[in-house]
Swiss-Prot record:
Metabolic or biological pathway: Phospholipid metabolism; CDP-diacylglycerol biosynthesis; CDP-diacylglycerol from sn-glycerol 3-phosphate: step 3/3
EC class name: transferase
Disulfide cross-links: none
Protein name: Phosphatidate cytidylyltransferase 1
Keywords, in A-Z order: Lipid biosynthesis, Lipid metabolism, Magnesium, Membrane, Nucleotidyltransferase, Phospholipid biosynthesis, Phospholipid metabolism, Transferase, Transmembrane, Transmembrane helix
InterPro entries (UniProt xref): PC_trans (IPR000374), PC_Trfase_euk (IPR016720)
Gene giving rise to this polypeptide: CDS1
Amino acid sequence: MHNDSNSGAPGTPSGRIRRRRGSNEVPPEVVKANGNHLLVNDRSKYKSMLIRAYSSVWMIGGFAFIIYMGHLYIWAMVVVIQIFMAKELFNLLRRAHEDRHLPGFRLLNWHFFFTAMLFVYGRMLSQRLVNTVTLDKFLYKLVGRFVKYHMVTCYFFYIAGFMWFILTLKKKMYKYQFSQYAWTHMILIVVFTQSAFTVANIFEGIFWFLLPASLIVINDIAAYFFGFFFGRTPLIKLSPKKTWEGFIGASITTIISAFLLANMFGRFQWLTCPRKDLSTGWLDCDPGPLFKPEYFTLPEWFPAWFLSREIAVLPVQWHALLLGLFASIIAPFGGFFASGFKRAFKIKDFGDSIPGHGGMTDRMDCQMVMAVFAYIYHQSFIVPQNLSIEMILDQIILNLTFEEQLAVYKKLGQIIQERTFGES
């Protein structure tokens, strides 16, 4: 229904009555993104676009520099992002009045956070840490002890936090404290599930981190610009500013970009080689069949102005198309979920750490969904399912002492010698 603005005189009570908007209605500030109005016609939106573009340029530049620095620096970047996300989410349900009566309660949240960090990264990177110190006997034994007792150490850290929480319980504050305890654990699950898969992708080869992350960025930028200049039709009520024009335009752009970026990234060993230790040196490896070009001859009807009748395609580019399809169709639902979450708590953004973009969590909503899919896809369709020599050696180095490894070496030599004499 549409109320006539002239139906009541300004001086009458009826003229002062304000109609209450329904919860599922499109807010007036975003109506111009739909119907017959375009955001491009709203001059006030250009300032917001410029701020957003300026922040994006700085983020992309910093991201490119960290990629150049290598695996460890990318991991450090992920840790920093985790800390920002946790801070934003911890603050979401905080109430200043209750916190004043609970000194040290915030510190307890961070105790659980760093305990979770030690557990997740300790399990994920223990083998690479062992590979890094193999040549130093003292460090090798020290790291071996850490790996052996890692789980029990993390358990006692957690139990210490659990006891700390119980001892801080105060009368009339139980409900608030238990809600914060549950909220903290939910945050840890969300943040560390995403980051664990992200870090695993990094050490499998920067390619498997960089391509999915880049596709989300491209999809986000393309959706913004297609929606800004052409958006008319609302896509979903949870995000009234999202339009079908932006969604479709971004999907096409993302899928094409996936095919082209895979070809570009796949030609650099720095991006394709997995990192087996925690060093920062240059990588040199056999890229494998996925990153070796295959040549295709274009048909005769292809336009004559094309530079060559033969094109080189990396097999990984076909996999990239599926990643691009997921990034453009499925991953945006992570953003829709975040939009619904923010509406539930009546907030515009999770934070304000990135001008024009909101908080770090606002930038990571789709990335979380994409990182998990990229890891599962890589493990299911890219990594060989049979045991490799490297995997067997990793298990020997990780689980056996130096004396046991020496015994395996002698026994293996004996078996090979017996087989050699038997064949002769």
